[in-house]
Amino acid sequence: MDAILNFLRSTGFAQLFTGENWKCLVMIIIACVLLYLGIVKKFEPLLLVPIAIGMLMTNLPGANMFHEILYAGGEIHWSLFGGAPVTAEFLAELEAAGVSADVLSSVTVGQSISIGLVDILYLGIKLGIYPCLIFLGVGAMTDFGPLIANPKSLLLGAAAQLGIFMTFVGCRVLLHFTGAEAASVGIIGGADGPTAIFVTAMLAPALLGPIAVSAYSYMALVPVIQPPIMKALTTKKERQIEMKPLRTVSKREKILFPIVVMIFVSLLVPSAAPLICCLMLGNLLKECGVADRLSKTAQNELMNIVTIFLGVSVGATATGATFLSPKTLGILLMGVVAFGFGTAGGVLLAKLMNLFLKEKINPLIGAAGVSAVPMAARVAQKVGQQENPGNFLLMHAMGPNVAGVIGSAIAAGVLISLFG
C-alpha cells in the first residue's frame, strides 16, 4: 500500500496541485491554445506547433526535461553539465545577479542535475546556431533579383526598421525595461522570428518565450495588422499607381550580390556577421548553379530539422515563472506597436520619395519592408489590386521585402553591439 501511495505522490498529477505548480497548469492551457491556433487556425503552424510542444514539455511537473538553472544569469554553466554539484556560493552569485527566486529554488545545495533532452537542444539557441542555420535556409529560398533590379527598394526595407527603434524607445520610457530587454522586444518590429530569437537569446534570455510567441503570432497576423495602416496613410490615387515591370537581372549580378553584401555588411556591423553570412551563403548556393544539392538540402531537410529544434527549444523557455508576468503583457502590446510603426515607416518613406522621383512608386510596397517574406509582399499586392484590379505589385514589393531581411539582421547587429 505504501508503495502505491509513494507512486501516486511521485506522479505529475499530484505535483500539479502543490506549491507554485499551478503556474504549470496555466502554461499547459496556453500551450494547448497555441496548438489550436497553429493546427486549426493555421497561424504560423511550422513554428507555433513545435513552440507549443516545447511549452508542454517544460511545464510537465516531474518530467525534468529543461533546467533553467543551467542557463541562469544569461550564461551557460558548463560545470553543471559536467555533473558538478550545486554550491551555496554558486546560488549566492546568481541571486546577486538578479536571477528569480523560482529558478534558484528549483535546485538545492549539493544536488547534481540530471541533464534533460531540452537542456541539450537549447544549446543551439544559446550558442546562436539555430537562427543562423534558419537564415542559411532562408537565403537558399530567397530571390534578391527584385532588390537588385530596383536598388531604391533597399531604402524602403531600411525605413521599415523604424518599428524596431520606436518600440525600443517605448519600452525604455513607458515600461521601464532595461536596454537589453527593450532591444529584444523592439526586434519584434522586424517581423523576423529567427532574428528576434538570436537577439533575445544573447541580450534577454529570460524573455525568449514571450518574445518568440509574440513575434510569430504577429507575423501570422500581418494580413490583418497591415491593411488598415496602409489605407490610413495613403490616398486612393496613390494606391492605384502602376509601376513599370522590373528589368531582367543577370546571373553575374545575382552571384556577385551575396558576396558583396556579405563583405560590406560584416565590415560595417560585425555583430550582424553570423546572420548575414549565413543568409548570403544560402543565397550563393542557390544562385551559383554548381551546388544544387547543398541548396536543396538547405531549403528542405536542414530547414525542417532546425525549425523543429528551434521551436521546441524556444517553447521550453516559457515556464510559468517567466511567462506569467506583467512583462509578458507589455511584450504582447509593444509587439503590435512594433509592427505598426514598421509598416508606417516603409509607407511614409515611399510617399516622401515620390516627391523627388519622376517615375512614382506605389507607397503600398513600402509596407512590405518588414521581413515577413513573402506575406508582407502578398498583402501589398492584395491591397493594390483592391483599388486597381490590373495592378501587379508583387515583384515590386518583393524588393523591399527581401531588403527587410537584410535590414533586420543589420538592426540586430547594431542592438547587440550596443547592449551585448
Question: What is each residue range found by the language model?
Answer:
Residues 1-20, 64-134, 201:
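Interfacial loop/helix-cap signal at membrane boundaries in integral membrane proteins
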Residues 34, 57, 124-148, 283-285, ...:
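Hydrophobic transmembrane alpha-helices of secondary-active transporters
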Residues 40-48, 66-67, 120-121, 141-156, ...:
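Interfacial helix-loop-helix linkers and transmembrane-helix boundary segments
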Residues 127, 135-141, 156-166, 177-206, ...:
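Alpha-helical membrane segments and immediately flanking helix-loop junctions
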Residues 147-168, 321-346, 397-401:
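Entry/N-cap segments of selected transmembrane alpha helices
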Residues 206-224, 334-342, 365-368:
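Alpha-helical transmembrane segments
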Residues 214-290:
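Membrane-embedded hairpin module used as a gating/binding unit in multi-pass transport
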Residues 262-346:
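Transmembrane helical segments that form the transport core of multi-pass membrane transport proteins
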